[in-house]
Structures are given as C-alpha cells and as structure tokens.
C-alpha cells in the first residue's frame, strides 16, 4: 500500500548512485586534480576556527557572496549562494515551473536539468544537437516558443561535449525565447568567455557558477546564482533557509580571496589539457571533440571495451553506455602522471 503514497512520475527514476569501483586514478567526474596546498589549507582552518557551530549559518551567506562578487565583478545584490549548482537548479524550477509546465534542454547536456524538472512535476523537453554536437539556434528558439517553455537550460561550455556557444548565439537566444534562460557556466574558467556581465541587460538571463571545478573545492558543495534584482528576489522565495553551511561559507570565502592561486591552478590544468589532447591526437582510430573545459569527449570503435580495459588497469573514466553517447568516453584532465598513465594504457589497445 505504501507505494501509492509516492509520486507517479518518480517511478521511472532510480536513485543516483556512484558505483563502488576499484581504481587508483579517478578521471570520471571532471574534478580538479589539484589538491589545495598547505597554505590554502592553513587559511581554511583559520577561517573554520571562527565558525560558531552552535548557531545556524548566515542565511544570506553574506561574506562568501561578497567574496564572489569581487571575484566575478558583479554587484553583491545580484548573487545568491546555494548548496552546489544542483540545489540552485532545483530552486529555479521550484520558483518558475508549475506542474505539467515545460522546461527545455539539449542533448547531450547535464541530465539533472530534466530530472529535477520531472521530479518537481514539470515536463522536460529535449532538443537534439546535430551529429557534431552543434546547436541550431534558430530551431531551438522556435521549438522553445512553440512548446511554451518556461525555462531553457544550457551548460556553456557544454558538459559533456566541451563545446561552447558564442556570446552572439546566447544573445540571440535571450532575445528570441519567451522564457527564462539559464546558462550554466560550471566550466567557464577553462574558456574565459562568460555571459555573466549581461545580467543587467537581459531580464530573462540567469547564470549559474560553481566552486567545484576551477577552484578545486567540489567537497564543499558551493554554487552561485547570478541574475537581475527582480528575478533574484522572486527566486529567493523558493530558497530554503540556512541552505549553505557555515563551514562551506568559511571555506568558500578563503578560497575566493586567493585569486592568484586560482589563476595559477587554471594555467596548470590548461597545460595538462593541451598535453593530453596532443598525445590523444596520435591515435588514428578515435575521434576527439574540441574542448573548452577540463575534460575531453572521445568517440571509440568500442567504448565499452576501452572503459573496461582502463578500469582493469585502475583508471576510471566516464562511460555513457547508451543513447547518443554509447560509443563515447569522457576523460577528465588529470595530473601529468595520470595523463601519461591514460596514454600508456591506450597505446596498448589502440593504433
């Protein structure tokens, strides 16, 4: 009887799980391979000493939002912190999408846009990218308007392809679509061309950012939503109180203050990306897709075989197994040692 209590639309979902795999090199989640150094850890510990663990967090996450405001060059009143971008996506949907209303995203893209919408009672419509994973902007606009979409979600750079939309393309979408447009810039630091400065010009633009990738802080689950003041005040109505822990706020503030450290880390990751692309390009039987992120999407003749071979050699990468990406693997850019391990193992099974 108890199963009748649950939403019908939950029946097609399975709980998100991370498989327990035996590996030594982890290149499946687009994390930074750089651990925070001793100086950064010391600064973080000093910040945490001031946390009042008996008190609820600052509900507005004021200090970390001010730090992010300085980092991104956007007014503080246009920024809201969240418990990772995932929570911010859920808040956007809760604020804007009623039951049976539509959101739209593209395929391939981050799957949780659609999942969170459908869990909340909305409908997720999928617009297909072409064979080379390019977006037909005109057809997207037409489809979004015909379907009366409430929110359009696009990651830029795209996850998992690594491709980017140019600012002019995004402007065209913003001008043409009768809906809120969420540009998820989780990987923007690896590309450096952001749309965030346009929030003052476009009333339907929402930008998402994260500390998980470029700032090597995935463990703390800290994201930011950036939009115009009216949009933000309305979205805040759907935000849970005290949603970002005091520890997360303290660590985020410490990391964001060290802009030179972040810059040097990005240079390191970009250098390793160039190294990995150069070495992978020598294999003639695979297809690399140009990337502006910290990962590389690769098409193999037998992706499942390559995935299992790498895993047998203690290297885990992202295996999609089905759908449009069943012949693809996504490999996170790792350290030089990790990247060389990938190349050395692939050289034993590829030409």
UniProtKB/Swiss-Prot annotation:
One of its GO terms (biological process) is L-histidine biosynthetic process. It catalyses: L-histidinol phosphate + 2-oxoglutarate = 3-(imidazol-4-yl)-2-oxopropyl phosphate + L-glutamate. The keyword Amino-acid biosynthesis applies. It is an enzyme of class 2 (transferase). Pathway: Amino-acid biosynthesis; L-histidine biosynthesis; L-histidine from 5-phospho-alpha-D-ribose 1-diphosphate: step 7/9. SUPFAM superfamilies: PLP-dependent transferases. Keywords: Amino-acid biosynthesis, Aminotransferase, Histidine biosynthesis, Pyridoxal phosphate, Transferase. The modification N6-(pyridoxal phosphate)lysine is found at residue 213. Homodimer. Its EC number is 2.6.1.9. Transmembrane segments: none annotated. One of its GO terms (molecular function) is histidinol-phosphate transaminase activity. Its cofactor is pyridoxal 5'-phosphate. The keyword Transferase applies. Belongs to the class-II pyridoxal-phosphate-dependent aminotransferase family. Histidinol-phosphate aminotransferase subfamily. Pfam families: Aminotran_1_2 (PF00155). It comes from Clostridium kluyveri (strain ATCC 8527 / DSM 555 / NBRC 12016 / NCIMB 10680 / K1). This is Histidinol-phosphate aminotransferase.
């Amino acid at each position: 009887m108890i199963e009748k209590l649950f939403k019908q639309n939950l029946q097609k979902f399975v709980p998100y799980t991370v498989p327990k795999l035996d590996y030594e090199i982890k290149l499946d989640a687009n994390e930074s391979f750089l651990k925070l150094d001793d100086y950064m850890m010391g600064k973080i510990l000093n910040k945490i000493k001031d946390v009042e663990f008996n008190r609820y967090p600052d509900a507005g996450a004021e200090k970390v939002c001010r730090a992010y405001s300085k980092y991104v060059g956007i007014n503080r009143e246009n920024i809201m912190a969240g418990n990772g971008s995932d929570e911010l996506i859920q808040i956007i949907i809760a604020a804007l999408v009623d039951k049976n209303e539509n959101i739209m995203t593209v395929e391939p893209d981050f799957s949780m846009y659609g999942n969170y919408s459908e869990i909340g009672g909305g409908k997720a419509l999928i617009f297909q990218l072409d064979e080379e994973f390019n977006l037909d902007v005109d057809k997207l606009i037409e489809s979004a308007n015909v379907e009366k979409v409430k929110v359009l979600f696009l990651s830029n750079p795209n996850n998992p392809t690594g491709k980017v939309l140019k600012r002019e393309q995004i402007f065209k979408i913003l001008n043409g679509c009768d809906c809120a447009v969420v540009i998820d810039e989780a990987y923007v630091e690896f590309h450096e061309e952001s749309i965030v400065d346009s929030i003052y010009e476009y009333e339907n633009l929402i930008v998402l950012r994260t500390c998980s990738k470029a700032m090597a802080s995935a463990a703390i689950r800290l994201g930011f939503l950036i939009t115009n003041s009216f949009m933000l005040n309305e979205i805040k109505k759907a935000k849970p109180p005290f949603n970002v822990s005091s520890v997360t706020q303290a660590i985020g503030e410490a990391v964001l203050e060290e802009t030179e450290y972040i810059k040097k880390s990005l240079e390191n990751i970009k250098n390793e990306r160039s190294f990995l692309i150069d070495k992978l390009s020598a294999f003639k039987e695979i297809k690399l897709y140009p990337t502006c992120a910290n990962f590389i999407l690769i098409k193999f003749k037998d992706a499942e075989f390559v995935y299992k071979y790498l895993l047998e050699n203690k290297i885990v990468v992202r295996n999609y197994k089905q759908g449009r990406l069943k012949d693809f693997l996504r490999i996170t850019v790792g350290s030089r040692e990790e990247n060389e391990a990938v190349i050395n193992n692939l050289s034993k099974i590829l030409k």
